[in-house]
Structure formats: structure tokens, C-alpha cells
Amino acid sequence: MKKQWEPPELEEMQVVILSLHQKWWQKMAAGEKVLELRKTKPQCKAPFRVLVYVTGGAGVLGEFICPEVLEIKNFEEAEKKSKVPAHDIHNYAAGSRNKVYGWEVADVKEYPRAVTLEELGIKR
């Protein structure tokens, strides 16, 4: 059963901003992409909220909850959840001392309109 976070829990969560290309955000928002691959993991503990900034000046288009960050060892399994081909994950890992982390994606929310970084109090 999927975990549902209540407003008090959401308010207490750390917030991370993640920059994504439009195509990956669309797959995430559609529920197809349930794992985001990164060479790093946040300093904060999971679960945490992730604001999704879409590159190209689109702004923050939504958010999700990351219930857990996993070290990826099986690239074929990660391919299914991330929609990134296993050979691309292998190449990506080669540039990061072979460590790739999978940020689990849950409770995706699309905003009705793009929010600018400035509206969030963030200066570029």
C-alpha cells in the first residue's frame, strides 16, 4: 500500500530542488518514471520533498516525495523504474566512481502553473 503523507508531515520535511529536462518530468508526472538517477544524494534524511525545476526556464512545474534514496547496483532493474537505458546508466556511473543513487519518486503533484525560483525566494 502506498504511503500517504499528511500536511503536518509534509511541513516538517526537508525540501530539495531538482533540475530535470522536460521529457523526464513528463514521464514522472505520468507515473512512468518512479526512480530518478543521480550521482549524489542529499544530506537530509528521507523522506523529503523535491521541487522539480524544469530546465530551459520553464520554472518549477511540480513536486514529489522521495521516501528513500538507494545505491543502485542493478542497472537493468533501475532501467525499468527510471526509463533510462542500462548502458546509459553504466556510462553515467563511470564518471562518478561507479556510484549512482536512485531517488524513489512518490506522490507526484503537478502545479496548475509554473512557479518561478524568485517566487520561492531563490535567486539564481
Predicted regions and their residues:
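Structured alpha/beta reader/binder surfaces that contact nucleic acids or chromatin modification marks
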Residues: K2-R124
